UniProtKB/Swiss-Prot annotation:
Regulation acting on activity, per entry: Not inhibited by 13-cyclopropylidene or 16-methylidenegeranylgeranyl diphosphate. The copalyl diphosphate synthase activity is not susceptible to magnesium-dependent inhibition.
Domain remarks: The Asp-Xaa-Asp-Asp (DXDD) motif is important for the catalytic activity in the class II active site relevant for the cyclization of GGPP. The Asp-Asp-Xaa-Xaa-Asp/Glu (DDXXD/E) motif is important for the catalytic activity in the class I active site, presumably through binding to Mg(2+).
Record EC number: 4.2.3.18, 4.2.3.132, 5.5.1.12
Similarity remark: Belongs to the terpene synthase family. Tpsd subfamily.
Residues involved in Mg(2+) 4 binding: D402, D404
Noted pH dependence of activity: Optimum pH is 7.2 with GGPP as substrate and 8.7 with CPP as substrate.
Protein name: Bifunctional abietadiene synthase, chloroplastic
GO CC, alphabetical: chloroplast
Impact reported for E778A: No or small effect on substrate binding, but strongly decreases abietadiene synthase activity
Residues that, per the record, bind Mg(2+) 3: N765, T769, E773
Pathway entry: Terpene metabolism; oleoresin biosynthesis
Length: 868
C-alpha cells in the first residue's frame, strides 16, 4: 500500500540514498566521500563555514574534512547568471552587543529554585484542599445568625458562639467588617447588623455604644462612594434594619438626607417587583429575604429553597427564613456552615464553582498552569459535573445562574475540550440584545462583562450568540474605560482597568501566553477583594503565592530564552547570513514567536528548530519574491528536491550562501530528528520544503508574467507560501512526542487545521502588506485577486471581505483547536502559530518594521526585561 505523501515514511529516498547520489555528482568532495564508501559507514554530508576564513568545510560524519575557497558575497558575484536586485530593509533593531551582553544576571539562584519547588507544592495543596470554598468572616451575616433564639425555648441565642464572635471582633474604630479593606457601605451595614443583634440579646453595651458612634460619624461617607460600590441588596436590607434600629431606640442619625434617599430607593424598587415574580422562580431577591420580611409569604417562599437548605447560599437570608418558619433544612444548612467555620459565617457559602474556575483562570493567566495539570483537570471535572445548560452560579446547588461564572466556565471548559454550548449565554440576554449578570435584571459590572468578552472570542462558526456578546461587551467596556465610576460592581481589583485595556487591545487571537502572563503579573492583585452582600476575600484565588511563583518562573524561563537567543545569533553569523544583502535580519523577532507560546524549558529544541526554519522562510521568501531570476530560483528549487550540492557552482554567490546554510542546517536537524523520532526524517523534511519552494516558485512565475490569479487560485497557493505549515511540520519533530503517521495526518498539509492556520496567516499578512508590495511591483494579493473576481467593488470593500473571511476562518480554527484529538503540544504549535501572525500584523508589517511598532515592546518584555 502506498504511504501518504505527508508521512514520515514517505517515498522520499533515505539519507543514505542521497549520500550515494550526491557523492557521484560533487567532484570537489570525491576524495573525502570515497573514504567512507562502505554503506555501513556512510553518514550525512554537511558543510560548515571555516572559522575565521572564507571557506566551506565539507565534512562526512565524524571523519575528515576538506575545504575549498569560498568568496564572500561582497567580493565577487561574477558567477551569477543574473544580478540580484538589492532591496532596502530597515536594519535589525536588536544589535549583537545587546544580545551578547545578556549574562542572565537574574538567573534563578539555587535558593530561588528551592522556593519555586516549595511554592508549587503549596499551591498544589491549595487545589487539593478546595472543598466548598475558602473565604473570610462576614460580620453582617454572623450577626443575623446570632439573632436566632434557642430552639429549646430558652431565652438564649441558639448559636452563642456567634454572639461571642461579634463581641470579640469589633474593630478599633468601633465598626465591624473586613478590617483589611474600608468601604463605608460595607462597614455601616455590618456595624448596624451587629449593634442590633447585641441590643436584642442585651449584651455588649460598650460595643454597641462604640458602634453607634462609628455609625453617626461615618454614615455620611456612603454618599461619597460610587453607586457601583454598593453591596448586593443594600437598598433592600439596609433601610429595613434602619427601621428596626429605630424601633429599638438606637440613637442613629435617621434624618440624614442620604439615608432618606436610600429608603426612597427601596420603596421604589419594591413597587417595581410584581408579587408573583417573587415566588415564580428563583431570583436574586432570595439573597436578601431578611430585608423583605414584611412582604414575604413564608409558605410560598419555601418552594424556592435550595437543595442544601439555604436561600441562594446566604446565611443571613437563610437565618431570617428559619426565624420565621422553623424550617429544619434551614437550620441544617446553618449548622453545616458553622461546622466549617466554627464561630462565624461568610456572606455566602458554598463558593465551590467560583473558587475552582477563578483559581484555574489565575494560574493560566499568570503562566504557571503547566505545574498544575492534574489539579486543573480535577477542578474542571468537578465544575463540568455541575454544569447546567441554563448556566451556573457560584455554587453547585445555586438555583440562580449568573453570567460571570457561566462565561468563565464556558470559556475555560471549552478550551480544555469539554462539550459545552454557547447557548447557555442566552439565559442572560434581554429582548434588546443586551447581556446582564442575572436573568431578568439590569445589573452588570466590569468584571462580569470582561469575562463575557473573553468568552466570546472562543466562538465556533455559526454561534451568533457569541458575536452578539462580543459586540455588546466591547461597547460596554469601552464606555467603562471612559467612566471612572464604572470600576467595579462585583470586585475591587488592583488594576481592573489594565485588564480591560489588555483584553480589548489583545483579544484571544492576538494574545500570546507569555505576553498575557507578563501583563497579568503586573495587573494581578494578591489582595483583591470581592463585593457580595459584604466585602469578602477568596484566598485560593487572590494569594501572594501565585504572584511570587509567577515572577520567579517568568524570570527563570526568560534566562533560558536569552541563552537560546545568543546561540541562534551565533548560528546566523556562522552560516554567513550576515553577508546577505537582500533579506531581513530578524533572528530576535522570529525567536520571540516560539518563545511567546512554547516557552517551557523542555521545548528548547523545538524553539530552536522553529526559529531556524522560520528564518529560512524569510530568507527564501525575500529571495523568491524579488531577488532572484526565475531560472536561478528553479535551480535552487531543484537543488533542494535533489538535495544536490553539485548545483551550487551554478548559483549566484548570495544564493550559494543560502543553499549551503540551508543544507547544513537541515542535515543537522534531520540527524537529531532521527534520534528523537527513531526513524529517518530527512526525506520528510525534504518533502515539506519541496512543497514550500513550489509555492514560492509559482508566485515568482505569477510575478514575472504579471498574472493576477482568481481569489481561490491565489488562496490555494498563498496559504502554503506563507510558510507557516513548513515551520510547524518540521518543528513538530522536536516536541518530545513521537510524531506518528496518525497524528501527522491531522496536522499535515491536507488537514483542515493546518490549512486554516495558513489561510488566516496569509490573509492577515496581506491586509497589512498589500499596498507596500503593490508599490514594489507585486501583482497578486488576496485583495487584488478578489477585486479581479469582482471588478465593480472598491478596494475597501475587497479589504472588508478579506477580513470577514479571516474572522470566519479564525472561528473554525477555534473549533479545530478544541476538537482535534491529538496531543496538546501539536495543537498548540498549529494554533499559536496562527495567533502569533495576528499579533505580528496587528498594526502593520510587524516583522519587517518591528523597530517602529509595538512588537518591539513585546520582544523586550518577553525576552529582555525581567519582572520585578
Amino acid at each position: 500500500m502506498a504511504m501518504p505523501s505527508s508521512s514520515l515514511s514517505s517515498q522520499i529516498p533515505t539519507a543514505a540514498h542521497h549520500l550515494t547520489a550526491n557523492a557521484q555528482s560533487i567532484p570537489h568532495f570525491s576524495t573525502t566521500l570515497n573514504a567512507g564508501s562502505s554503506a555501513s559507514k556512510r553518514r550525512s554530508l554537511y558543510l560548515r563555514w571555516g572559522k575565521g576564513s572564507n571557506k566551506i568545510i565539507a565534512c562526512v560524519g565524524e571523519g575528515g574534512a576538506t575545504s575549498v575557497p569560498y568568496q564572500s558575497a561582497e567580493k565577487n558575484d561574477s558567477l551569477s547568471s543574473s544580478t540580484l536586485v538589492k532591496r532596502e530593509f530597515p536594519p535589525g533593531f536588536w544589535k549583537d552587543d545587546l544580545i551578547d551582553s545578556l549574562t542572565s544576571s537574574h538567573k534563578v539562584a539555587a535558593s530561588d529554585e528551592k522556593r519555586i519547588e516549595t511554592l508549587i507544592s503549596e499551591i498544589k495543596n491549595m487545589f487539593r484542599c478546595m472543598g466548598y470554598g475558602e473565604t473570610n468572616p462576614s460580620a453582617y451575616d454572623t450577626a443575623w445568625v446570632a439573632r436566632i433564639p434557642a430552639v429549646d425555648g430558652s431565652d438564649n441565642p441558639h448559636f452563642p458562639e456567634t454572639v461571642e464572635w461579634i463581641l470579640q471582633n469589633q474593630l478599633k474604630d468601633g465598626s465591624w467588617g473586613e478590617g483589611f479593606y474600608f468601604l463605608a457601605y460595607d462597614r455601616i451595614l455590618a456595624t448596624l447588623a451587629c449593634i442590633i443583634t447585641l441590643t436584642l440579646w442585651r449584651t455588649g453595651e460598650t460595643q454597641v455604644q462604640k458602634g453607634i458612634e462609628f455609625f453617626r460619624t461615618q454614615a455620611g461617607k456612603m454618599e461619597d462612594e460610587a453607586d457601583s460600590h454598593r453591596p448586593s441588596g443594600f437598598e433592600i436590607v439596609f433601610p429595613a434594619m434602619l427601621k428596626e434600629a429605630k424601633i429599638l431606640g438606637l440613637d442613629l442619625p435617621y434624618d440624614l438626607p442620604f439615608l432618606k434617599q436610600i429608603i426612597e430607593k427601596r420603596e421604589a424598587k419594591l413597587k417595581r417587583i410584581p408579587t408573583d415574580v417573587l415566588y415564580a422562580l428563583p431570583t436574586t431577591l432570595l439573597y436578601s429575604l431578611e430585608g423583605l420580611q414584611e412582604i414575604v409569604d413564608w409558605q410560598k417562599i419555601m418552594k424556592l429553597q435550595s437543595k442544601d437548605g439555604s436561600f441562594l447560599s446566604s446565611p443571613a437570608s437563610t437565618a431570617a427564613v428559619f426565624m420565621r418558619t422553623g424550617n429544619k433544612k434551614c437550620l441544617d444548612f446553618l449548622n453545616f456552615v458553622l461546622k466549617k467555620f466554627g464561630n462565624h459565617v461568610p456572606c455566602h457559602y458554598p463558593l465551590d464553582l467560583f473558587e475552582r474556575l477563578w483559581a484555574v483562570d489565575t494560574v493560566e493567566r499568570l503562566g504557571i498552569d503547566r505545574h498544575f495539570k492534574e489539579e486543573i483537570k480535577e477542578a474542571l471535572d468537578y465544575v463540568y459535573s455541575h454544569w447546567d445548560e441554563r448556566g451556573i452560579g457560584w455554587a453547585r446547588e445555586n438555583p440562580v445562574p449568573d453570567i460571570d461564572d457561566t462565561a468563565m466556565g464556558l470559556r475555560i471548559l471549552r478550551l480544555h475540550g469539554y462539550n459545552v454550548s454557547s447557548d447557555v449565554l442566552k439565559t442572560f440576554r434581554d429582548e434588546n440584545g443586551e447581556f446582564f449578570c442575572f436573568l431578568g435584571q439590569t445589573q452588570r459590572g466590569v468584571t462580569d462583562m470582561l469575562n463575557v468578552n473573553r468568552c466570546s472570542h472562543v466562538s465556533f462558526p455559526g454561534e451568533t450568540i457569541m458575536e452578539e456578546a462580543k459586540l455588546c461587551t466591547e461597547r460596554y467596556l469601552r464606555n467603562a474605560l471612559e467612566n471612572v465610576d464604572a470600576f467595579d460592581k462585583w470586585a475591587f481589583k488592583k488594576n481592573i482597568r489594565g485588564e480591560v485595556e489588555y483584553a480589548l487591545k489583545y483579544p484571544w487571537h492576538k494574545s500570546m501566553p507569555r505576553l498575557e502572563a507578563r501583563s497579568y503579573i503586573e495587573n494581578y492583585g494578591p489582595d483583591d477583594v470581592w463585593l457580595g452582600k459584604t466585602v469578602y476575600m477568596m484566598p485560593y484565588i487572590s494569594n501572594e503565592k501565585y504572584l511570587e511563583l509567577a515572577k520567579l518562573d517568568f524570570n527563570k524561563v526568560q534566562s533560558i530564552h536569552q541563552t537560546e537567543l545568543q546561540d541562534l545569533r551565533r548560528w546566523w553569523k556562522s552560516s554567513g547570513f550576515t553577508d546577505l544583502n537582500f533579506t531581513r535580519e530578524r533572528v530576535t523577532e522570529i525567536y520571540f514567536s516560539p518563545a511567546s507560546f512554547i516557552f517551557e524549558p523542555e521545548f528548547s529544541k523545538c524553539r530552536e528548530v522553529y526559529t531556524k526554519t522560520s528564518n529560512f522562510t524569510v530568507i527564501l521568501d525575500d529571495l523568491y519574491d524579488a531577488h532572484g531570476s526565475l531560472d536561478d530560483l528553479k535551480l535552487f528549487t531543484e537543488s533542494v528536491k535533489r538535495w544536490d550540492l553539485s548545483l551550487v557552482d551554478q548559483m549566484p554567490q548570495q544564493m550559494k550562501i543560502c543553499f549551503v546554510g540551508f543544507y547544513n542546517t537541515f542535515n543537522d536537524i534531520a540527524k537529531e530528528g532521527r534520534e528523537r523520532q527513531g526513524r529517518d526524517v530527512l526525506g520528510y523534511i525534504q518533502n515539506v520544503w519541496k512543497v514550500q519552494l513550489e509555492a514560492y516558485t509559482k508566485e515568482a512565475e505569477w510575478s514575472e508574467a504579471k498574472y493576477v490569479p482568481s481569489f481561490n487560485e491565489y488562496i490555494e497557493n498563498a496559504s502554503v507560501s506563507i510558510a507557516l505549515g513548513t515551520v510547524v511540520l518540521i518543528s513538530a519533530l522536536f516536541t518530545g512526542e513521537v510524531l506518528t503517521d496518525e497524528v501527522l495526518s491531522k496536522i499535515d498539509r491536507e488537514s483542515r487545521f493546518l490549512q486554516l492556520m495558513g489561510l488566516t496567516g496569509r490573509l492577515v499578512n496581506d491586509t497589512k502588506t498589500y499596498q507596500a508590495e503593490r508599490g514594489q511591483g507585486e501583482v497578486a494579493s488576496a485583495i487584488q485577486c478578489y477585486m479581479k473576481d469582482h471588478p465593480k467593488i472598491s478596494e475597501e470593500e475587497a479589504l472588508q471581505h478579506v477580513y470577514s473571511v479571516m474572522e470566519n476562518a479564525l472561528e473554525e480554527l477555534n473549533r479545530e483547536f478544541v476538537n482535534n484529538k491529538i496531543p496538546d503540544i501539536y495543537k498548540r504549535l498549529v494554533f499559536e502559530t496562527a495567533r502569533i501572525m495576528q499579533l505580528f500584523y496587528m498594526q502593520g508589517d510587524g516583522l519587517t518594521l518591528s523597530h517602529d511598532m509595538e512588537i518591539k515592546e513585546h520582544v523586550k518584555n518577553c525576552l529582555f526585561q525581567p519582572v520585578a
